[in-house]
Amino acid sequence: MENTTILTDKEFEIFNQFSQKLNPNTKHDYLSKIVLMKAFLEEKDLLEVTKYECNEFIDYVKDKYAKSTCEKIYSYLHSFYNFMNKKKYIEINPFTYVKKPEVSRIKTKDDVLSVQEINKLVEILPKLNIRDRVIMIFLATTGCLLNELVNLKWKDIIMDEKNNTYVRLGKNKKERVVKLHPYCFKLIEDYRDYSGLSEVILPTNDFVFTTQKSNSITDRNVRLIVKKALDYAGLSQYSAKDFRHSFAAISLRLGADEEDIKKQLGWSDKYYAIRYKYVLNFVDSESVDYIMNNDHLSINNK
């Protein structure tokens, strides 16, 4: 839990106004970034910081965190200060004068798991509890975002008249329905059985993934689960986001249409595929997108 007590009553009141429409996980994420900056500034009033102090803070996070995290911290704080400027709490947004950390969107072979590496993950599944097994296979076979997995509810799992199973992912313009791999659904059934839930999946608003202390799970929980699994498999160089990269790159390498990948991953633009063009010559000639027809992926023997 973040130490929110270092925020003044006024700062916390402003944050609550700013975060009214955010979901709980996003709200917590924003708050953690604001508290981080407050701590760095030795609890100086956030309404009185200068562009120089903001720049020093961004330099600090660039030395401490990954580039993508630095970009996120900058974007969150820029948004928060824009809100304060718009509501006349401050005269100007100091982050306007701070250079945004740049992150390359081009993916390389270091961002992509090979089929052999995915097989290594499958081999270590027995070391994980049933919930964590479902999470790992779900990430590997759907290409979903972490927040989509975290927010998954039982009503999002669909079965057609031929007993094919699908999952509804995303919201609004990014909402899409993708097919579940049979082994992924088998694990989901095992997970329900272990959790004492009925065999029939009812369309409830309950979250699919929970913890012993909560009826939901957080992004951080998932990252820790993925890290543990990757460490077991000797693949600690990867992280949770690399499952999505792998899904996209390997599918494109096998010749999947950019429009199909756009729909599967919820991209707003099919030309996001350009991000992956440099990796296509390095990945295996198998596709996670079509793993149900792939004899080289051990998941199909489960």
Regions from the PLM with identified roles:
Residues 90, 104-120, 173-183, 199-205:
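DNA breakage-rejoining catalytic core of tyrosine-based enzymes
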Residues 265-290:
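Catalytic-site neighborhood detector that most strongly recognizes the C-terminal catalytic loop/helix
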Residues 9-25, 31-108:
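N-terminal core-binding DNA-recognition domain of tyrosine recombinases/integrases
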Residues 170-190, 204-225:
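C-terminal catalytic core of Y-nucleophile DNA break-rejoin enzymes
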